Each structure stands twice: as C-alpha cells, then as structure tokens.
Amino acid sequence: MAADGQCSLPASWRPVTLTHVEYPAGDLSGHLLAYLSLSPIFVVVGFLTLIIFKRELHTISFLGGLALNQGVNWLIKHVIQEPRPCGGPHTAVGTKYGMPSSHSQFMWFFSVYSFLFLYLRMHQTNNARFLDLLWRHVLSLGLLTAAFLVSYSRVYLLYHTWSQVFYGGVAGSLMAVAWFIITQEILTPLFPRIAAWPISEFFLIRDTSLIPNVLWFEYTVTRAEARNRQRKLGTKLQ
C-alpha cells in the first residue's frame, strides 16, 4: 500500500487491443468508421447468442468456419510478416503484422458465406413470395456493404494498407467458398447423426438443415401448439 498522498504506478500498462480502436480527434467519419471496425466482435457475440438459445448445428459450423478463417489469417500474417503502414499513429495493436487484414478477412468470410447461404442453401423455397426475395436481396447487399465499409475503415484509420485489406478480402472470400462447400457436401450429411448423439441430446443440439425456412417453421409450430394448449385450457375451464 502506498502512503497517503503518494502515488505508485506499475512498470507498464497495456490496453485490451481487441476493442481498442483509435480515430482522429474531431473526425466524425473516423468516429463512425471506428465503431464499424468493431463489427467482427458484434458478429461473434451474435453467433454465441444464437448458439446458446438455438443450439443449431449449422450455426455452430458457421462459427467454426469463422474461427478457422481467423486461424488461417494468423498463420499467413506470421509467414509473410509484412508490417502495418509506416508512420501509423497506433501503438496498441494485436500484432505488428498487417498482411492480410484480419478484419477484412473476417467480414468478407462472413458476408460471402451468408450470401451463398441465402442464394444456394435457401433455394429450396421455390414458392418464395416477392417480399421474401426482396428481403434476401436487401440483406445480401447490406452484408456486402458492411464488409466493404469495415475494410475501408482499416485503411482510413491507418491500421492497414489497401493491399492488405484487398488480400484479406480475397482470402476471406475464398475461405468462405471452401467452407460452404465443406459444410454442404461433407458436414451437412453428418448433422442428423451428430444430432442423435447422447451428448447432443443432452445439450438439446438440433439439426434443421432439411427445413428450408426455419423462421416460418418455428412460427407455425409455435402458433399451432399455442392454439392447441389454449383449446385444452378452455376445455378444462368449462
């Protein structure tokens, strides 16, 4: 304990770089882009929330692909060892290497995989209404726009060069295509067997890969069950 009126500081302090983003003071665009560059964290939190409450195998597989994608990014960075932009103002970064950009690779993996899922995996809904198709197009455009803006933010905020975010986007897109093929051709046929494992049944892990529109399915099943219980309750009260 330091004596009253005296201050003692540790030898050094380090920030948590996972959420540490700097932007030029007074720059509104930089401020907004700094928040946008945190999108990968929001995506991961969203996935964890979905897995906890839905416990669906495809969602778990998607998150596993994102984790693998980040592992590949780390490996490439430490093989190429290209530094971040010269003269950059940032000292608190996760790694001194910048090729390829992990933010760009993450967001392009997420966006391209989601794009493929929306247009190839959900093709089974042949009777899709106009609003369903419009929603799919708008969502896809939003995902691709978000990936571009996050990539741009890393250049604007001087964390990466254009080439680093470009190759990050290319790597993420290629990884997304490869993981989508692996999921569809190898993992999806195994999902029913995995869902039947005792440990999966214990944790209520489920497989919805054969249901083209899970949201509509859950809505109709829940509504039917609620009406059935309401009828039973009404019968008991009579």
Curated annotation (Swiss-Prot):
Pathway: Protein modification; protein glycosylation. One of its GO terms (cellular component) is endoplasmic reticulum membrane. It comes from the Eukaryota. It is an enzyme of class 3 (hydrolase). Belongs to the dolichyldiphosphatase family. Required for efficient N-glycosylation. Necessary for maintaining optimal levels of dolichol-linked oligosaccharides. Hydrolyzes dolichyl pyrophosphate at a very high rate and dolichyl monophosphate at a much lower rate. Does not act on phosphatidate. This is Dolichyldiphosphatase 1. It comes from Mus musculus. The lineage of its organism: Eukaryota, Metazoa, Chordata, Craniata, Vertebrata. The gene is Dolpp1.
